[in-house]
From Swiss-Prot:
PROSITE patterns per record: SECA_MOTOR_DEAD
Organism field: Pseudomonas entomophila (strain L48)
Cofactor binding remark: May bind 1 zinc ion per subunit.
Protein name per its UniProtKB record: Protein translocase subunit SecA
UniProt-listed NCBIfam families: PRK12904.1, secA
Length: 912
């Protein structure tokens, strides 16, 4: 009850932060005259001066006012653009590691230059992250003259870039690229066989453009580098033939069965489940087709792979629809980003789902893949020392940014007040009535000379709208995943008088819609335009611009509400940029997905109570509130799913960091002889203890087993039984010493034959190979564990705790296997002198061959919904936080940071 009063007295946290920053803005403004008086050379020289002052102990915070003043003056001279005061606040927000929410058209790209310039002075590199290659290249080339004027270098990273070019881009002061490329390069670096092959430096400071798209929308999507696994395309084809014979089981709300069937669909969680009748039916069909042995169950351990194929086929047919979740282009399945409407070339669904869709569409089925390396955007971006971001819509997700990334959101006030009118939603009974109303609104707006942007949620809807408009004879442009190449061109002219554009969701995001059209695009379309032509184009544009403003600006029409309020706000934000006039209106029907699944009953009852007739619309605050409540419910559920994904991945991430740290230490080490000697000692001790338990009687010794193990692991055929028979004084400790001496001498002899330098190089390469192979297998094992762990909930066990416990056991086994397999390979190897240059060339050829077979993909985050549900149904056990390691150095006898309960030296300290 006191919160509103306190807010009135002291202002909101956002207002207090802005008030604090305004003092620094005044300091920057006070330096403006001084900067204006400097020559270009003197202004450029400020960069070297700042670097020198940093080296002498000054901080970036102390340099900020002067550095911002320098960047502002450079912007005026090079770009013809001066940073507004609110843009200075935006720059400070980014520098302080926060998210700046700025409305469309407020100059986010220019704001970024302030924080980027300041942080690039440290020489540690700055990464500017965008959602696609087009924006990365556009922004880098747009701002390059400014940075180069100030003496900084700019690089761009992209897919299929030559290694040397990419390495140079990362070495630049400022590097632009997409979130995908930065993430994949991180994974590639941790698969490199030498330091020279690595691309990235330390992850210092990152500015993420459209941060909500990358850290929220993409958060559930793992980045995966994979290699081909065994071919099972015939199985997908067989399963695909069986799926259409299954029927859906449907029940009404009261539980009355209206259609007996084999499976149920939960639209809220996007899950499909076989019921008992379905399991029996599918088992019978699989038995008849010879895929399942007579009398066997699908749930037998050796048939679980077959069950996975069945569910993949079921999901492909019942949850994935052509032109909604994917399109077919050039014989390939291209997934559609539900948030932007863009296709995602190269991205494949995991767990055989992509292959199942290929079988459904009668396409060539590509081989399944095996994970070689993986991470998530959540974990990758948390590796940066400082993280920041910009977007037009972050405030609705402020809680998630704070919880997951420790990022606060600052709402930056606009330079000019918002003049856009946001009309109440109109809700109709049927979709046909809704579309008719949209066309009426379009006609009225176009008659006034206003440009109109119609936002749709799917390609299917955009094409349906297009067909309706064609019947009416209304000229329009369609922007969706099918016409991705024309995106920038269509968006550029979407603000022309009377222009009508249909866009799937937020396709074209990152490009402003300028009222009157884009005169620069018109100039660019001409070959060698004269100054007179350019002047004429600008004059014509000015007239059109004024004409559109007087008509009321851009009118945004949405054909339905999205699950997320943020996506709705992004669509609205296309109108009313920089204080321009504009308006928005959402048209809904009870047949829309969101309304049908989440909000229909309450609204339907309300509409019935009003006695609404066909063609009538309801425009009421209660309806809008009901819809927003439904959206909040979906947002909350999606947040829980993303949070749960992170909790599971945090376990894998700690293991990933340990393995990658070990790998990087290996690459940096010149000599790992001592490490190999330690491994040999530990493996030998474990082998001896396994067959000759400590403090045991000779009668309890398994001498034959020890001889066999030494022959297997160390390639040493030692007559241990003969030694014992000949020497009565040979007891446990002296036997252990003799075995160590024999094996060490044999290895030293091998070193003498090969040469110390050659063997050290060979040891490093073997350890890297063993580590990579076992890590790859470990990832596969972790995947299997992860996808089945939710079933523990039915046994009244907490799935997260079980996953954490079992994954730790698996990791301990991995560490032991790395040591044992490395020693086994080194012990069995036959010494053959090879020219070092030939050896290096051979290894490089093998690495290139491996790289050629790799796939860089995003897997879906499959099964998260069912996992979430199962864990809720399981035991009510308090879930411990996922293990987080701080930077403090642990003593070897202290409890390990991972939460295993073991001492550090017996746990993760073993490999550090």
């Amino acid at each position: 009850m006191f919160a509103p009063l306190l807010k009135k007295l002291f202002g909101s946290k956002n207002e207090r932060e802005i008030k604090r920053m305004l003092k620094t803005v005044s300091a920057v403004n006070a330096l403006e005259e001084k900067m204006v008086a400097l020559s270009d050379e003197q202004l450029r020289g400020k960069t070297a001066e700042f670097k020198e002052r940093l080296a002498k102990g000054e901080t970036l915070d102390q340099l900020l006012p002067e550095a911002f003043a320098v960047a502002r003056e450079a912007g005026k001279r090079v770009m013809g653009m001066r940073h507004f005061d609110v843009q200075l606040i935006g720059g400070m927000t980014l520098h302080e590691g926060m998210i700046a929410e700025m409305r469309t058209g407020e100059g986010k790209t220019l704001v970024g230059t302030l924080a980027v310039y300041l942080n690039a002075l440290s020489g540690k590199g700055v990464h500017v992250v965008t959602v696609n290659d087009y924006l990365a290249r556009r922004d880098a080339n747009w701002m390059r003259p400014l940075y180069e004027f100030l003496g900084l270098t700019v690089g761009i990273v992209s897919a299929f870039q030559p290694p040397e070019e990419k390495r140079a881009a990362y070495a630049a002061d400022i590097t632009y690229g997409t979130n995908n490329e930065f993430g994949f390069d991180y994974l590639r670096d941790n698969m490199a066989f030498s330091q020279d092959e690595k691309f990235q430096r330390e992850l210092n400071f990152s500015v993420i453009d459209e941060v909500d798209s990358i850290l929220i929308d993409e958060a559930r999507t793992p980045l995966i580098i994979s290699g081909q696994a065994e071919d099972s395309s015939k199985l997908y084809i067989e399963i695909n033939r069986l799926i259409p014979r299954l029927t859906q089981h449907i029940e009404e709300v009261e539980g009355q069965v209206t259609q007996e069937g084999h499976y149920t669909i939960d639209e809220k969680s996007r899950q499909v489940e076989l019921n008992e009748a379905g399991h029996q039916f599918i088992e019978d069909m699989l038995t008849q087709s010879g895929l399942l042995a007579e009398g066997e169950s699908l749930y037998s351990a050796h048939n679980l792979g077959l069950l996975t194929h069945v569910y993949a086929g079921l999901r492909a047919h019942k949850l994935f629809h052509r032109n909604v979740e994917y399109i077919v282009q050039d014989g390939q399945i291209l997934l559609i980003d539900e948030h932007t409407g863009r296709t995602m070339p190269g991205r494949r669904l995991s767990e055989g789902l992509h292959q199942a869709i290929e079988a459904k569409e009668n396409l060539n089925i590509q081989a399944e893949s095996q994970t070689l390396a993986s991470t998530t955007f959540q974990n990758y971006f948390r590796l940066y020392t400082k993280l920041s971001g910009m977007t037009g819509t972050a405030d609705t997700e402020a809680f998630e940014f704070a919880q997951i990334y420790n990022l606060n959101v600052m709402v930056i006030p606009p330079n000019k007040p918002l003049a856009r009118k946001d009309f109440n939603d109109l809700v109709y009974l049927t979709a046909d009535e809704k579309y008719a109303a949209i066309i009426t609104d379009i006609k009225e707006s176009m008659a006034l000379g206003r440009p109109v942007l119609v936002g749709t949620a799917t390609i299917e809807t955009s094409e349906h709208m297009s067909n309706l408009l064609k019947k009416e004879g209304i000229d329009h442009k369609v922007l969706n995943a099918k016409y991705h190449e024309k995106e920038a061109e269509i968006i550029a002219q979407a603000g022309a008088p009377g222009a009508l554009t249909i866009a799937t969701n937020m396709a074209g995001r990152g490009t402003d819609i300028l009222l009157g059209g884009n005169w620069e695009a018109e100039v660019a379309a001409l070959d060698n335009p004269t100054p007179e032509q350019i002047a004429q184009i600008k004059a014509d544009w000015q007239k059109r611009h004024q004409q559109v403003l007087e008509a009321g600006g851009l009118h945004v029409i949405a054909s339905e509400r999205h699950e997320s309020r943020r996506i709705d706000n992004q669509l609205r934000g296309r109108a009313g940029r920089q204080g321009d006039a504009g308006s928005s209106r959402f048209y809904l029907s009870l047949e829309d997905s969101l309304m049908r699944i989440f909000a229909s009953d309450r609204v339907k009852n309300f509409m019935k109570a009003l006695g609404m007739q066909s063609g009538e619309a309801i425009e009421h605050r209660m309806v809008t509130n009901a819809i927003e409540k439904a959206q909040r419910k979906v947002e909350g559920r999606n947040f829980d799913i993303r949070k749960q994904l992170l909790e599971y991945d945090d376990v894998a991430n700690e293991q990933r960091k340990v393995i990658y740290h070990m790998r990087n230490s290996l690459l940096a080490a010149q000599n790992i002889g001592d490490t190999i000697a330690e491994f040999r000692q530990e493996v030998l001790d474990a082998t001896i203890s396994q067959h000759i338990p400590p403090q045991s009687l000779p009668e309890q010794w398994d001498v034959a087993g020890l001889e066999a193990s030494l022959a297997s692991d160390f390639a040493m055929k030692l007559p241990i039984q003969q030694w014992l028979d000949e020497d009565d004084h040979l007891y446990e400790e002296t036997l252990r010493e003799r075995l160590i001496k024999e094996i060490t001498d044999a290895y030293n002899e091998k070193e003498d034959q090969a040469g110390e330098d050659a063997l050290r190089t060979f040891e490093k390469q073997i350890l890297l190979r063993v580590l990579d192979d076992l890590w790859k297998d470990h990832l596969s094992t972790m995947d299997h564990l992860r996808h089945g762990i939710h079933l523990r909930g039915y046994a009244q066990k907490n799935p997260k705790q079980e996953y954490k416990r079992e994954s730790f056991t698996l990791f301990q086994e991995l560490l032991e296997s790395i040591k044992r397999d490395t020693i086994r390979v080194l012990s069995h190897v036959q010494v053959r002198r090879e020219d070092p240059a030939e050896e290096e060339a051979r290894l490089r050829r093998e690495a290139e061959e491996l790289a050629s077979r790799m796939q860089f993909q995003h897997a879906a985050a499959p099964g998260m919904e069912s996992d979430l549900q199962a864990s809720e149904e399981g035991a009510e056990v308090a879930v411990a936080a996922a293990p987080v390691r701080n930077d403090q150095k642990l003593g070897r006898n202290e409890p390990c940071w991972c939460g295993s309960g073991k001492k550090f030296k017996h746990c993760h300290g073993q490999i550090e």
